[in-house]
């Protein structure tokens, strides 16, 4: 499972 914080950091990166 991926942590919400990681998803936010990646999304943000994009």
From Swiss-Prot:
Q: Which domain of life is it from?
A: Eukaryota
Enumerate the UniProt keywords alphabetically. Answer: Chloroplast, Membrane, Photosynthesis, Photosystem I, Plastid, Thylakoid, Transmembrane
Return the GO cellular component terms, semicolon-separated: chloroplast thylakoid membrane; photosystem I
Report membrane topology.
Answer: Multi-pass membrane protein
User: What is an annotated GO biological process for this record, any one?
Assistant: photosynthesis
Q: Where located? A: Plastid, Chloroplast thylakoid membrane
Q: Which family does it belong to?
A: Belongs to the PsaG/PsaK family.
Q: What does this protein do?
A: Not yet known.
Q: What is this protein called?
A: Photosystem I reaction center subunit V
- What is the scientific name of the source organism? Cucumis sativus (Cucumber)
Name of the gene? PSAG
């Amino acid at each position: 499972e991926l942590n919400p914080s990681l998803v936010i950091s990646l999304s943000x990166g994009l």
